[in-house]
């Protein structure tokens, strides 16, 4: 052997090797290997996006108020086959019957308090980006109190809505008889989501999937929402990071005064009304290096889990909360884009 | 700082050396162990480093490096920055087929923190193949280890008639769109 090296093979550590405990990931979590993983389309985001536009004044903010300050779980939906927005009343009746049947399954005795579920479906024509987009559809389940049917006191227990804001990419080459409402937002018990989902799946031959938001897209949201003007003083911009490869979970919360964040963003952004990937990177890099200077922690090595700003807050598991009605359309536009890229 | 050069040392008899560079220690170590477990008819030395440049004080002990694999974890933006910074300490002659980028974590698109365009661009800018894998899965780790071994064999000149440059050109053609 040359140089008197021992025969055989060896691993050698070079320099300052960080020896992290190689804690295995919990198996079976978040493993979703679908889609063209190795293709060039994977994990790409467009070079630039438009800033979320402010809503026009003619749209009534009160109408959309019930969508605000609630946690919505995101799903992506493939196009609905033979769906007609004129038949919403019939659909509501059919869904009501279906839910009653599902609830009765396996029950020998009719538990009447449980079964009085009323289904309402309505259109939300305000929620769209352009005339091309189909009107959003709202589904609400409410519990009838069987004690006093005359009072007709109803308690809302579950709501979900389908929407499509500026889904031009998908709308252009959609085959006939299909309606594209790629984004589905749910607030309520998961059991109802499953029942409603399976009815839509059977009736319109569509497919639901949870829509997770990747840390990369969360950085986009952080930058986009920081750049938005908000009238009054709002909550701090907060970024939540989780540190991987640790035996115990460790979360780092990074809160920035919204005005400071806006000031930083204004120095980064070059063309008004438009955001590029590069600008998003520079913005996050600035925040990371500031944090590193104070705490000697590389936030870029951690996972961005949650972004909350005065506009909205988003969690990587696909949970969103809208806080400003005027930017509702803008936020939905980005979410629609993500939903479309998931189903394509 | 010391730039890593491919040809300033003599090769050792019947052996080949690979250098794995990446910020995440755990998966790299596992990959190295998987490579050692593979059956092979030559000796391999695996050197692990979290970043370049390599410390110069042990330079005289280090064998000639035949292949450098930069490991990028798409879940960590830091790993990409780290690799980008390390590339400055590699001699240009390495990029004639003796460098590859190993991108791990590709099964978890939902955890992606890195813009994929940046990784593709890295491969194009440095004329080096980009290999996608998931080092946290045993099956893919073993397959990746085999693949790297085969590349190492070529880069060390142990496959008659196939040079590192020739091989990387082949890889580029097959990876091209």
Swiss-Prot record, chain A:
Role of this protein: Component of the CENPA-HI complex, a centromeric complex involved in assembly of kinetochore proteins, mitotic progression and chromosome segregation.
One GO term describing the cellular component: inner kinetochore
Keywords: Centromere, Chromosome, Nucleus
Family: Belongs to the CENP-L/IML3 family.
Gene source species: Gallus gallus (Chicken)
Subunit structure: Component of the CENPA-HI complex, at least composed of CENPH, CENPI, CENPK, CENPL, CENPM, CENPO and CENPP.
Pfam families: CENP-L
Compartment(s) of residence: Nucleus; Chromosome, Centromere
Region (Disordered): 1-32
Keyword Transcription: no
Principal location: nucleus
Ranges of compositional bias, category Polar residues: 20-32
The name this protein goes by in its record: Centromere protein L
Curated annotation (Swiss-Prot), chain B:
Compartment(s) where it occurs, according to its Swiss-Prot or TrEMBL record: Nucleus; Chromosome, Centromere
One Gene Ontology cellular component: chromosome, centromeric region
Chief location: nucleus
Keywords assigned by UniProt, alphabetized: Centromere, Chromosome, Nucleus
Tree of life domain: Eukaryota
Main function: Component of the CENPA-HI complex, a centromeric complex involved in assembly of kinetochore proteins, mitotic progression and chromosome segregation.
Subunit note: Component of the CENPA-HI complex, at least composed of CENPH, CENPI, CENPK, CENPL, CENPM, CENPO and CENPP.
Protein name according to UniProt: Centromere protein M
Gene name of the encoded protein: CENPM
